[in-house]
A protein has these predicted regions:
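Short alpha-helical DNA-recognition segment
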Residues: 20-46
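A short, Lys/Arg-rich alpha-helix, primarily the initiator
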Residues: 1-21, 28
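DNA major-groove recognition helix of helix-turn-helix
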Residues: 30, 48, 59, 78
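Short, solvent-exposed amphipathic helices
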Residues: 62, 73-76
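Interfacial/linker helices and their anchor residues that mediate assembly or domain coupling
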Residues: 78-108
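The DNA-recognition helices of helix-turn-helix-type DNA-binding domains
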Residues: 33-34, 51, 78-82
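Short, basic-rich loop-to-helix N-cap that marks the start of a DNA-contacting helix
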Residues: 38, 49-65
Length: 108
C-alpha cells in the first residue's frame, strides 16, 4: 500500500479502466513468462481485489508496460524489490547507506 492508501490491485484496476480495457482484454495481454501463455481473467480479478499478489517481477513489469504505470511504483505497492536490486540488497552495509541517502533526500 502506498502512502496515499492505494493498493497494488487498486492501481492496476484504475489504470486498466482509464485505458478502457476489460479484465479479459488486459489478462490476454499479460504473459506469465517470456514464452508462456496469458494470465487468466480470474487471476487478474483476484489481483485487482487484493486477494492475490503478482507472482513474479516479470508480471509487475508487464503491468507497468501495458498500463503505463512506473515500474518502481508498482514494485513498491507489491512490497517487492525489483530483480536488479536484489543482489545489491544482499549487502547490509550497502542497504543502510542507500536508505540513509534516501531519507536525506526526502528531508531536503
Amino acid at each position: 500500500m502506498s502512502a496515499d492508501g492505494v493498493t497494488f490491485g487498486q492501481a492496476i484496476s484504475k489504470a486498466r479502466k482509464a485505458l478502457g480495457l476489460s479484465q479479459k482484454e488486459l489478462a490476454a495481454r499479460v504473459k506469465k513468462e517470456e514464452s508462456g501463455g496469458s494470465i487468466s481473467p480470474q487471476y487478474l480479478n483476484d489481483i485487482e481485489h487484493d486477494r492475490r499478489s503478482p507472482s513474479s517481477g516479470h508480471l509487475i513489469r508487464q503491468f507497468s508496460g501495458i498500463l503505463n504505470i512506473p515500474e518502481d511504483y508498482l514494485f513498491a505497492l507489491a512490497g517487492r524489490l525489483p530483480d536488479d536490486l536484489r543482489t545489491d540488497a544482499s549487502d547490509p552495509d550497502k542497504v543502510v547507506r542507500a536508505f540513509a541517502s534516501f531519507r536525506k533526500t526526502l528531508k531536503e
